[in-house]
């Protein structure tokens, strides 16, 4: 028996904010550009505060899932100097140029975009490999995102650096929406709460929550906070909950997101469902706090046809 509950209507709200300009072969990084250009692009920053909670894994899998739904998607790896998004997508050997090269006029923006061979409507853009994060300003990020919107990307997902320093502030500056990734551990929840406050302080109020590495066995023993408890503590609309899955390690080493596996694991199903809710195609959650033993396996059987 499966349990579902209706997603709140307000979780799909969006705040319109201005984007910035794009030049022909390089990104215009002038400080004078105040052009207010409307765009249909959704600009979403994926953040966590605490490192190691699965933020980059979530970005890769949700981004890939959205692309599989038919939308044009670009993932920006803004974790400067510690990039890993290319590894999770299996694109590490194809990066020739980065955004820093575009800023410096060494290449065009389209040359720095790496298109996924499996899904042509998914692209990756790395900010840099070895430069300090402080070299990328808010204006740089805003102009970059406007340039990508002008290339008709429907979804622009920014994989934000961990922490709450200057790199975080610069990375979130062009975003309209935010997705906070956390686990049920107390330190991660505390950091997520602080990040939510910083996002609101910087004008981002459309915030959603993704709870990662959920273990039903620990929840039933009261050794882990439930999904509902975490959501209530943070007071942020819930996008989804991802069960613990050992296949994440295998997926990372192979450079293949979980959502591309022929036989989806429970976490792969959960990532796909979260992506569908993000684009407004699914209104219901699977209740991972169900007291019935084996609910995860029942969900898996339902989607895998067993």
Swiss-Prot record:
**Principal localization?**
plastid
Q: Where in the cell is it found?
A: Plastid, Chloroplast
- The regions listed as transmembrane in this protein's record are none
Q: Which domain of life is it from?
A: Eukaryota
* Residue stretches in coiled coil: none
Kindly state one GO CC term assigned in the UniProt record: chloroplast
Kindly indicate where the leader peptide sits in this chain: none
Cross-referenced InterPro entries: CobQ/CobB/MinD/ParA_Nub-bd_dom (IPR002586), MinD (IPR010223), MinD_FleN (IPR025501), P-loop_NTPase (IPR027417), ParA/MinD_ATPase (IPR050625)
Q: Which sites bind ATP?
A: 50-57
User: What keywords does the record list, in alphabetical order?
Assistant: ATP-binding, Cell cycle, Cell division, Chloroplast, Nucleotide-binding, Plastid, Septation
**Record's Pfam families?**
CbiA
Give me any GO biological process, just one.
cell division
Q: Which GO terms describe its molecular function?
A: ATP binding; ATP hydrolysis activity
Q: Which cysteines are joined by disulfide bonds?
A: none
The job of this chain, per UniProt, is described as: ATPase required for the correct placement of the division site.
The family classification in the record reads:
Belongs to the ParA family. MinD subfamily.
* Protein name, UniProt field: Putative septum site-determining protein MinD
